[in-house]
Amino acid sequence: MLKSNNASETAAHKVGDKTAKKVFFRRRKGCPLSVSNAPVIDYKNPELLIKFVSEGGRMLPSRITNVCAKKQRKLNNAIKIARILALLPFVFQAK
């Protein structure tokens, strides 16, 4: 009796699979700072760091910038140091 139940369950799953919608996953691009000619992450380079800071002055998360975890940590530390040395503002003023 158990075998017949399992057979009917698998048949139901097969039918359900055909009607199920396909899920489309967009392939993530690689880290823009890990390519061969990428700029070096340094607190003395505010032009690079400002690209990873929001309009309000907050650091953008890696899911938005597509930066790998290792480079995200380096970016966060560089932004913090640049703020302390007054190379970057802590809060951007509204225009």
From Swiss-Prot:
InterPro entries: Ribosomal_bS18, Ribosomal_bS18_CS, Ribosomal_bS18_sf. Disulfide bonds: none annotated. One of its GO terms (molecular function) is structural constituent of ribosome. GO terms for cellular component: cytosolic small ribosomal subunit. One of its GO terms (biological process) is translation. It holds the Pfam family Ribosomal_S18. Keywords: Ribonucleoprotein, Ribosomal protein, RNA-binding, rRNA-binding. The keyword Metal-binding does not apply. The keyword Protein biosynthesis does not apply. NCBIfam families: S18. Part of the 30S ribosomal subunit. Forms a tight heterodimer with protein bS6. Belongs to the bacterial ribosomal protein bS18 family. Binds as a heterodimer with protein bS6 to the central domain of the 16S rRNA, where it helps stabilize the platform of the 30S subunit. This is Small ribosomal subunit protein bS18. It comes from Rickettsia peacockii (strain Rustic).
